Amino acid sequence: MKTNHPETYDGRQDHIPSLKTPEIESFTNVYEGKDYTIDFTVPEFTAVCPKTGLPDFGVIYVSYVPTKRCIELKSFKEYILSYRNVGVFHEFLVNKIMEDLIAAIDPKYLKVIGDYNARGGIKTVVTREYNKI
């Protein structure tokens, strides 16, 4: 039994790392040097399945400990909305969000979770954590 299908999936996500999205803006952390956590949730995230073209729905959770900069939420909302019509696998999306947030604010700690609605009887949760060395 063949378990992978490179002819079906290879190359479908090559554009994701360089995908042009709105800038995630930031502001100065006036409590730099104090460790505190900022958590926020995107309860109505939508993108498109690159395989089927059907919409994917889920919740995106972000938790971070800032250093010098904090995420400006209106710009993050615009960033998240830019994925609405993008065909992206769950795993690629969580990693792309993680890398874009690291580039924007260089946090001490960051966790991104993509908790997707069940499709075809399968629920997907993708988690990535980052700790600054």
UniProtKB/Swiss-Prot annotation:
Keywords per UniProt: Cytoplasm, NADP, Oxidoreductase, Queuosine biosynthesis
Gene3D superfamilies: 3.30.1130.10
Binding positions (substrate): 71-73, 90-91
Protein localization: Cytoplasm
Any single Gene Ontology cellular-component annotation: cytoplasm
The keyword Cytoplasm appears for this protein: yes
GO biological process: queuosine biosynthetic process; tRNA modification
Superkingdom of this protein's organism: Bacteria
Positions annotated as active site in the UniProt record: 49 (thioimide intermediate), 56 (proton donor)
Family that this chain belongs to: Belongs to the GTP cyclohydrolase I family. QueF type 1 subfamily.
Role according to the record: Catalyzes the NADPH-dependent reduction of 7-cyano-7-deazaguanine (preQ0) to 7-aminomethyl-7-deazaguanine (preQ1).
Protein name per the record: NADPH-dependent 7-cyano-7-deazaguanine reductase
Protein source organism: Leptospira borgpetersenii serovar Hardjo-bovis (strain JB197)
Gene: queF
